[in-house]
Amino acid sequence: FFQAEDGIRDRSPSRGLGDVYKRQYAQARIMPAERLVSLPDFIEDQQAAAMMLQGMTVEYLIRRTFSVQEGQTVLFHAIAGGVGLLACQWLKQMGAVVIGTAGSEEKAALASAHGCDHVIIYDHEDIVERVNEITDGAGVPVVYDSVGKDTWDASIASLQTRGVMVSFGASSGLPDNFSVNQLQFKGSLYVTRPTLLHYVATRSDLLGSANALFEAAKNGLKVDINQTFPLEDTALAHRALEARQTTGSTVLIT
C-alpha cells in the first residue's frame, strides 16, 4: 500500500520506490515521501534493494567528494565488495584507471571481471610497492578507503602530493595514533570522512544522486547480488559479512 503526502505529485503507487535509509529490516515501513525516489522501469525491485544505498554511495564518492577525471588513476580498497564492484564499473565508464585491493585470488578475479585494471591481493603483496610500480612512482591523486586501520598507512603512502584520502568506513577499526601533522610531511595531503547522509540532505541532492545512478545503470552498470537470505536469517547474513565470506551485494528476502 502506498499513500502519498499532500502536495507530493511525482511518486507513483504503480511503480517501485527506492530509499537510502540505513538500519531497516522490515516488510513494511513508514517513510517521509520526500525521501523516496521513483524507480525507472528497467530497474527491478531486487536490483534496487541492492543498488540504492551502495550505488548512491559510489556516486557521491567519485563524483563529488573527489571528482574523478578521465585518465586519472585511483586506488579503491575492498574492490570486490558491493560498493567496490559498482565503483569499479562506474569509474571505468568515466575513463579512469582503477587499482583495487582484495583479500583473495577469487575476489581478485571477480574484480578483474568487472573491469579493474590492477588488483592487489593485500595479504600477499605490498600495496605501496605495487601502486608505485603501476604509477611509475607518481602515486595516486585519491584513495577510497573503507577498511581503516589495516590499510590506513598504505593509503596515505600511496598518495601523490596534495592527494586526497577519502575514508568512508573502518571495517578493520580506526587507525592508531593518527596525527594531522602527517599530512604535511607526506605531501600536504587532504583527509575527508564523508557519509552519504550529508550528500543527499536536500531533495535536490537526493534526486541528483539517484538520477546519476540510474543513468549509469542505463549505460551498463550492474549490481551483483551474490548472496540472498530470508529475512528470518538476518543473523546468518551478518555472520557471513563479518567473516568476509561475501562478494558483491547481499539482499534479505521477505
What are these regions (language model features)?
Residues D150-N219, T254:
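Glycine-rich phosphate-binding loop and adjacent beta-alpha segment
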